[in-house]
């Protein structure tokens, strides 16, 4: 487990507290304390909004969280997104990754990385293929949905030579991005909430960086992947 994976959520909670939009703001986690099932104990408000800080409506958000919070039973396929618990109202929101603003967020990241790392020269978007990298899992088909939606929305804008999905655990795999297109210039945007294990370690290694080098770079405070890196005749 990468300890940095919870940092963005904790920072977001601090920012929301500073804005005074809600009476209370608290965090709960799957693998860290406080746990998801402790949500009601963490605040005293009568109405509690529970927002998954995840990208897609997948196995975790549609089965694990609802079950732990009592919105659904283990064998229940559907559930209501609000419930009463000891005279308090719990409202289960949809993941932040499904919000309409995510398209502009992804495009902003894609443009920024090219501007920051133009060597040997900044390629035109019309000669660049953009990959949106997600997790993917056979446990729940919705895990792909957020990535596929963004791929189509960005493709419709016609800025890039092509826009393609890539996944950790499903086809098309991240490691196959170099053979997925004839274009030389590639940009890959990890569609993950945090710079955790997948974004910082798994993806660089899947793209061809040796594990020892990735670990060494991270230990010294460097990015695991150096932009741009040439691999298999492509510049990513």
Set out the residue ranges of the language-model regions.
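Active-site-proximal alpha-helix that buttresses catalytic centers in soluble enzyme cores
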Residues: 1-236
């Amino acid at each position: 487990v990468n300890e940095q994976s919870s940092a963005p959520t904790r920072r977001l909670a601090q920012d929301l507290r500073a804005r005074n939009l809600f009476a209370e703001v608290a965090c709960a986690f799957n693998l860290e304390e406080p746990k998801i099932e402790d949500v009601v104990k963490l605040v005293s408000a009568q109405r509690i909004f529970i927002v998954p800080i995840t990208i897609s409506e997948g196995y975790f958000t549609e089965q694990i969280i609802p079950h732990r919070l009592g919105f659904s039973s283990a064998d229940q396929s559907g559930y209501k997104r609000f419930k009463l618990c000891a005279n308090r109202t719990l409202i289960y929101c949809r993941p932040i990754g499904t919000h309409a603003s995510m398209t502009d967020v992804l495009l902003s990241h894609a443009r920024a990385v090219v501007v920051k790392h133009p060597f040997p020269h900044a390629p035109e978007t019309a000669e660049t293929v953009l990959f949106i990298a997600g997790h993917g899992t056979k446990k729940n088909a919705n895990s792909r949905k957020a990535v596929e939606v963004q791929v189509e929305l960005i493709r419709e804008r016609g800025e890039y030579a092509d826009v393609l999905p890539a996944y950790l655990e499903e086809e098309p795999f991240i490691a196959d991005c170099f053979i997925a297109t004839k274009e030389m210039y590639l940009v890959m945007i990890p569609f993950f909430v945090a710079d955790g294990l997948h974004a910082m370690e798994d993806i660089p290694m899947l793209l061809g960086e040796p594990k020892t080098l990735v670990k060494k770079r991270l230990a010294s405070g460097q990015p695991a992947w150096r932009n741009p890196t040439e691999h298999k005749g492509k510049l990513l």
